[in-house]
C-alpha cells in the first residue's frame, strides 16, 4: 500500500527530517515504549502482591500506531498499516492463554468486558463480544472476519478494511463520500 495519493492522509507537511533528528525521534519513541512497559510491570506486580492478579481482567491497547519515517511520515494520523495495526492484549485469568492474529476492532472491547464480568450489555451496542474467542471456543473470523478503520481528513475520508491476510484502503474526496 505504498500509493502516493495516500500520503495526503496527513495534514503535516512532508518535510525531510535530518538523519540526526530522525534518530532522536526513534530513540524517544523506543524510550516511551520502555517506560510504559516498566509501568505495566509495576501494575502487574502490585496486583500480584495484593492477591488480585488471579481475579483481575487486564486489557491493554494502543489507540494508534506511529510512523517513524515510513512513507515519509512522522505522525500517527493515517490509514496506513503502521497507524492502524495497534497492540491489543486481553488477559482473563479464567481463560486459556493464546495468541490471536486476526484483526479485531476496539468496538469489541466493551461488549467483551461486559460478558466476562457478567454484566448486562446495553441495547444497540456497537461491536461484537469476543468472549468466545477469549475462552478459546471460537476463532475471531467466526465472529467478524474483518476490521474497519476510518480516518477523516479535510475534504477527504479514508476507509480501510483488514482481515488476517489482506487490506483494502480507499480515499474518497468529500464530494464522493456523501
Task: Kindly label every feature range from the protein language model.
Residues 164-172:
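Low-complexity, glycine/alanine/valine/leucine- and proline-rich hydrophobic stretches
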Residues 14, 154, 167-168:
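Active-site/binding-pocket entry motifs
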Residues 1-103, 116-123:
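Active-site-proximal cap/lid insertion segments
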Residues 54-56, 94-161:
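Polar, surface-exposed loop/tail segments
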Residues 86, 159, 166:
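Residue-level detector of short, conserved catalytic/binding motifs and their immediate flanks
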